[in-house]
Regions:
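Acidic, mature catalytic/reactive cores of soluble proteins
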Residues: 1-754
């Protein structure tokens, strides 16, 4: 190979060699230097290093960071470097596990996972819940838009791997017993992986076949396993059970682990399932997948078909909900147990594509039903619910509204334009809205009870319980005490229900009959007083970061992108013109609250710098390359109307305002594909930007629209604001053929918003 080669040419040459292992390694290669830290650097998943030189002081390409933040940034990066979209997808799925999750950290050299340290009380392992679906889905959509056929080519191509993370999710029976303690660390497997890594390098952290080679599967299998893992925790009418010891995007909801149910992930699954249905719509015959995956898929399909029947006959209740969840959970455990024992798969077998499509249809029915059940009476949507497992019943209770839930519902694709507009109207008038900043908190602010108002046993409950009365009479403070005001309180040492159980068992023998009689009632009183189930974690007890009264700017910008997506979906589907205009108005309402529109005194910081959050008691805090930057890179391209469909570029600037255009002549400086700084003189009533390092100039005109491509061989003009696939691919590949693009836009094609 030459010292420099086009990436597409490299992939082509590797394909011609016909070695699947080499194809895997080449596909996931990303020639970038990038270090990504997010949040508290003391957390192991946030460790990073920006390494530019090797030990011999030679330049190297290297990157590392936590999984979520790497991939959320790469979504925006690939919009400007689209030839690497499929490589990012490969990097993503090659590092996901056999049980459908992802390690917490990713580097050019491979993957990392947190190692359990029994002597460290802060050491904690597990899997975050939402990353596997929505971040992958956004990348899949980009591939489909920029390269319409590439995903189809990969569906049956065995060039993808599984990460071999030494975590073991417990049996479903164990999860039902204690959903907060569900993941164990397999020390023996971890030691074995270390031995293999010593001889094979980074590939030693992947699942291997019997010959010692990396076990490789196709894209259909990888996409299916990610979905099946979520469906294995489906609660009809509730969401996805958070039972892998970690929360989701908002890790300040850490106490929701175990009893929490995510509507957020369910909404993203809806988008994922709809996309997979489109992707497989033209596929016929059989596809080869691992035998254990085939069995899991077929069992899940049958169970979801039963669920569809319950939904159709309006028979979903606490008992039938339990039956469906139990069946799905046991199927997932049967699969996990088998692949854990084998440390991999036994063989491959053919599965009819129609079976997968049937599964997707069944799943969509269950998902749509559950989303509908989680629409509140005011038109907003629940984000997280609470689960109670009692014998053979699953009961679902609700929390307060959260901004995250509205973003997920809008992003799901399940809502039509009038429903979206109604939800946004309600959101702006809800307790989530902070008028002083014209934007949204993560959840409504609320007044927490003072310390002395906590842990009070209502007198009617204390007086009616014979055991409590006996303990107080005997002046036994093991379980309850009376304070100076006569209020009955639980002993401060009873930090959880397990400790309460221990202390009840340790009471004197003469009280044990009363303990047996009143045990259930005591636990009910304990939960009534503390309501542990509804405690969300740091989000319910702190006042900065993701705490009470706090604006988290990344989620605000996620809302902005979701509203923009709904706007373009409405235009694509020829929705009512008034609904489309209302969506545009809502978009700019959300946008108006973002920092760059504010003065330094309003924002509490320099307005064009990204900040993590704004607490109620101060200005913007914690500057840095937050996820907000990624979302607003994407929304800005959307405002400019750059829409990629079927490999073509459609310029549709209907969200762009006239005020964006220069009123005077200006000079525009940009860096071209040869890394040379260039100047472009702009006329009044124009604006300029670059995409794939090609300058694009918009000009306001009073006549008809037009588009001009200035190429090496001359000019190409068109009355349609469309760049065909041939020239679009030239732009995406940065091949230098297109030197500049000029777009003439009549005022009536721009937004009417001032």
């Amino acid at each position: 190979l030459a010292n420099t080669i086009s990436y597409n040419e490299l992939l082509k040459q590797v394909d011609e060699i016909g070695c699947p292992q080499l194809q895997r390694l080449t596909m996931e290669y990303l020639p970038i230097t990038f270090g990504r830290r997010h949040g508290d650097p003391s957390r192991p998943w946030n460790q990073f290093e920006i390494k530019l030189l090797d030990d011999e002081k030679q330049k190297i390409l290297s990157y590392q960071g936590n999984w979520r933040d790497i991939f959320q940034n790469w979504e925006a990066l690939t919009f400007s470097y689209p030839e690497f979209i499929e490589s990012v997808i490969a990097k993503f799925v090659n590092a996901s596990t056999v049980d459908g999750y992802n390690p917490y950290r990713i580097t050019k050299q491979g993957i990392d996972w947190e190692v359990e340290e029994p002597d460290d009380p802060w050491s904690y392992i597990g899997y975050w819940g939402d990353h596997q679906i929505i971040y992958l889905q956004k990348l899949l959509e980009l591939s489909h838009q920029f390269h319409p056929n590439k995903l189809t080519e990969l569906l049956r191509k065995d060039v993808f791997s599984y990460a071999n993370v030494p975590y073991r999710i417990k049996s479903f029976a164990d999860i039902k017993q204690n959903a907060k303690s569900t993941v164990t660390y397999d020390n023996a497997l971890a030691d074995k992986i270390d031995e293999v890594v010593a001889s094979k390098g980074a590939d030693g952290k992947l699942i291997l076949d019997q010959s010692g080679q990396v076990y490789q599967v196709n894209l259909i299998e990888k996409l299916s396993v990610a979905l099946l893992a979520k469906l294995g925790n489906l609660i009809l009418g509730g969401g996805i059970w958070l039972n892998t010891q970690r929360p989701e995007w908002n890790d300040a909801n850490n106490a929701l682990v175990g009893q929490g149910v995510s509507v957020v992930t369910l909404c993203y699954m809806r988008r994922y399932v709809e996309f997979m249905l489109q992707l497989l719509s033209n596929e016929k015959g059989q596809v080869s997948v691992s035998s254990e995956v085939a069995q899991w898929l077929q069992g899940t399909r049958a169970t979801l078909a039963n669920a569809e029947g319950l939904i159709a006959s309006d028979e979903v209740n606490d008992e039938s909900r339990f039956q469906i969840t139990n069946q799905l959970g046991e199927l997932a455990w049967s699969y996990r147990d088998t692949v854990y024992q084998q440390t991999g798969f036994s063989a491959k077998e053919g599965v009819e594509v129609n079976e997968i499509i049937d599964l997707l249809h069944n799943a969509k029915v269950a998902i749509d039903y559950t989303i509908a059940q989680n629409q509140r009476q005011d038109g907003l949507y629940h984000a997280y619910n609470l689960l109670s497992l009692n014998d053979d019943r699953l009961e679902v209770d609700y929390l307060y509204p959260m901004l995250e839930g509205q973003v997920a519902a809008l992003s799901s694709g399940a809502l039509d334009a009038p429903t979206v507009n109604n939800a946004l109207d309600v959101l702006f008038s809800s307790d989530v809205f902070r008028p002083d900043q014209h934007t949204f908190m993560l959840y409504p602010d609320r007044q927490l009870p003072s310390f002395l108002n906590k842990n009070k046993v209502p007198s009617e409950l204390a007086n009616s319980n014979e055991l409590i009365a006996a303990l107080l009479q005997q002046d036994n403070h093991t379980i309850v005490v009376k304070d100076a005001n006569g209020d009955c309180r639980f002993n401060g040492k009873l930090t959880n229900a397990d400790r309460l159980q221990e202390e009840l068992a340790a009471l004197p023998a003469e009280l044990q009959m009363a303990v047996e009689r009143d045990r259930g009632e005591i636990f009910k009183i304990y939960e009534t007083v503390f309501n542990h189930k509804a405690f969300t974690g740091r989000s319910g007890g702190m006042f900065g970061f993701e705490g009470l009264g706090s604006i988290y700017w990344h989620m605000v910008s996620k809302l902005l992108l979701a509203v923009q997506e709904c706007y373009f979906n409405a235009t694509d589907n020829n929705a009512d013109a008034d609904d489309i205009q209302r969506l545009a108005n809502h978009y700019y309402q959300v946008r108006q609250g973002i920092g760059f529109n504010k003065t330094p005194s309003e924002y509490g910081a320099f307005p064009v710098d990204p900040y993590s959050h704004t607490p109620k008691h101060s200005g913007a805090q914690q500057p840095g390359m937050t996820g907000q930057v990624k979302e607003e890179v994407l929304t800005r391209f959307g405002e400019l109307g750059l829409r990629v469909r079927h490999g073509q570029i459609k310029v549709q600037p209907s969200l762009l305002r006239v005020r964006e255009f220069n009123t005077d002549a200006k000079s525009f400086t940009y860096l071209n594909i040869n890394n040379e700084w260039q100047n472009l003189e702009l006329e009044p009533n124009s604006l300029a930007f670059t995409w794939c390092q090609v300058p694009i100039v918009y000009r306001l005109v009073e006549t008809k629209p037009g588009l001009t491509l200035n190429t090496k061989s001359g000019q190409m003009t068109s009355d349609a604001l469309l760049i065909d696939s041939e020239m679009a691919q030239s732009l995406f590949k940065r091949d230098g053929i297109i030197e500049s693009i000029y777009v003439d836009i009549p005022r009536d094609q721009l937004s009417s918003i001032k």
